[in-house]
């Protein structure tokens, strides 16, 4: 799995370099930049290192930041009892079934129906659930949610999405700098620095927004895989039951708080335009995919 992911990463970066080379050749940008003292290869390497570096720093800090920002209380199995002990035991059993190292397990207090997995590697991961999820879902549904999150860990989704984000970061940095430099040459010398600075900021924001559509697309494909993995671990019916409970919570007109919480999670949404930025496919599509699968 690791070699396959690295191979995909290398292939993606080769395609990035080839695409940039073709674009610069067709537009005649390369000689123009060289004539003005900008080395295209050096800029590309710089953007790649910073883009990937930022993505991996975020990955390395992901577990720490999640605990701090979400207020996750990690369960100590030596002193846990009641619902905490039951939750820990469920994760332990599912992790053993998936042949995974035991992750840290935590609970954070929030009315939203949510759970997530994070961490830089399979051996250093965290699975956390909200108190709202534990209050809303029954045992079978909780089992499905936990299996889904552990499937993310087993599939290496945190690393995969980091690689994709790093490539997008590199693209954003590279093209925003190239275009901002080209725009700055169209004004007087004394205004070039200001134009280049402002254009770089505006283009970086614009390209980042467009790049997030690409990242969200890949994230949605990983969600389907995690659903399939969760179905294998906990059973298809448990996985479907969990998603159906989420859908009922989201669709309940009297529960606007639950609707807002799920919309914040980007689990689903009624705005077709915003669906491009959603990291999760529509719940209806996920349920249908599971019902049509053979798990």
From Swiss-Prot:
Keywords: Cell inner membrane, Cell membrane, Hydrolase, Membrane, Metal-binding, Metalloprotease, Protease, Transmembrane, Transmembrane helix, Zinc
InterPro entries on file: HtpX_protease, Pept_M48_protease_HtpX, Peptidase_M48
Topology versus the membrane: Multi-pass membrane protein
Subcellular location: Cell inner membrane
Record GO biological process: proteolysis
Binding site for Zn(2+): 148, 152, 223
NCBIfam families: PRK05457.1
Name of the protein in question: Protease HtpX homolog
Gene name of the encoded protein: htpX
